[in-house]
Amino acid sequence: PRAPTAEDAIGGWRPKGFVNLALLKGYKFSFESSSDHGSTHISYALVYAEGNTREAIVAAMKKRHTYAATDNIIADFRCGEHMMGDEFTTAEAPKFRIHLEGTAPFAKVVFVKDDLEVFTATPDKAQCDITWKDPDAKNGTSYYYVRGEQKNGELVWASPMWITCTLAK
């Protein structure tokens, strides 16, 4: 069975909740989800590791190459050769790609920049590739992540990237 909803368990989603506030304060971490009880198949902590060893998995977690989901959803969030969790500098406006493979069609896929929803796609497909280039990129550091919501309510959160833009003036 599914776990209680956020409304039932903690009084609802708070837009300025724990994760958003921590990111705005400059903390750098990746997303993962897990249950605090014996239920299975209601939350997934997923890791992009170079191998299936303890060392490779821990190394990937230290790089923040992880994401969270409430179902068996594949997410691959990249900006050029960089992936979720990375910190890097670019002289161009960042261009992102998210590849999603869900268990149901995605109702919406939202790109978040510095706590603001800056782009929303409505793919209506269980498998999709979405690209987005930040039209408002400015010099300085911003974080970006992606949240996907399937039509059946299942969610996926691709971990943030921290990108420092050094655009020509």
Regions found by a protein language model. Name each.
Residues 1-10, 17-169:
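C-terminal functional module detector
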